[in-house]
Design a protein with these regions (language model features):
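An N-terminal assembly and electron-transfer interface module characteristic of large anaerobic redox
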Residues: 1-171
Length: 171
């Protein structure tokens, strides 16, 4: 179901006059959980940009650049190579791509750290107040109200601490 919403989002971009749309296929994510061997996205997530390209003729209209390259998030060097290759039309240099990839992965580490720190705060609160909490597991697209149907707000109405699965996966 979430993938179906992409059609509307792409149409919205086109209606706003956006002429370059970058929607990469991502088969492999970073393997950030030690001792696991599966960091492969589901086929829908990994390949839906191809489906969109095949099913939305407006993406093939003159003047529209629809970019759907394959990226392997687990291989930083390959990411640099692919960025240079895919953005050659914009004259992106290898140095620029390396800087961008390094900054993106560094910021992702900051984000993961921040999420874990918030989780630790919630756990400390639960211990201090002798209360239970909820670990809310999901995918990034679950923040869309069309998809989550207000479940996060309903959970919040119980006044329990909510912890992201990303905050505690390492425990």
């Amino acid at each position: 179901y979430p993938a179906k919403l992409v059609h509307g989002h792409i149409k919205w971009l086109l209606n706003k006059g956006i002429k370059t749309i970058f929607y990469p296929c991502v088969s492999y994510e970073e393997n950030f959980v030690p001792n696991t061997d599966n960091h492969y996205n589901c086929p829908v997530v990994a390949n839906y940009p191809v489906v969109i390209g095949a099913n939305m003729p407006e993406l093939r209209e003159e003047g529209v650049r629809y970019m759907r390259p394959y990226f392997n998030m687990a291989n930083h060097e390959l990411m640099v190579d692919r960025i240079v290759e895919e953005f050659a039309w914009a004259n992106v240099t290898r140095e620029e791509a390396e800087t961008a990839v390094k900054a993106a992965y560094a910021e992702n580490e900051v984000f993961k750290h921040d999420v874990q720190m918030e989780g630790l705060k919630a756990l400390a609160y639960m211990k201090e107040h002798d209360c239970k909490g909820i670990v809310l597991a999901g995918r990034p697209y679950h923040v869309d109200p069309e998809i989550n149907h207000g479940i996060p707000e309903m959970i919040q109405s119980y006044h329990l601490p909510i912890i992201s699965e990303d905050a505690v996966y390492h425990m």
